[in-house]
Amino acid sequence: MQHCILILAWGKCILKAKFFLPLLPVRFVLGDPEDNAGTQTGDPARGR
């Protein structure tokens, strides 16, 4: 049973990596909202 859970978790990690990998350059340009929320005042993604 743990083996199936491990495979499911690993599959989710792979899917997340494949989904978010093309978005990495965008996150670097705009800044990571989780890391520095509110530190960039002129960020167009935040509507300012």
UniProtKB/Swiss-Prot annotation:
Lineage, highest ranks first = Viruses, Monodnaviria, Shotokuvirae, Cossaviricota, Papovaviricetes
| Taxonomic superkingdom | Viruses
Naturally occurring in which organism (per UniProt): Bos taurus papillomavirus 4
Keywords (alphabetical) are: Early protein
- Name the record gives this protein: Probable protein E5A
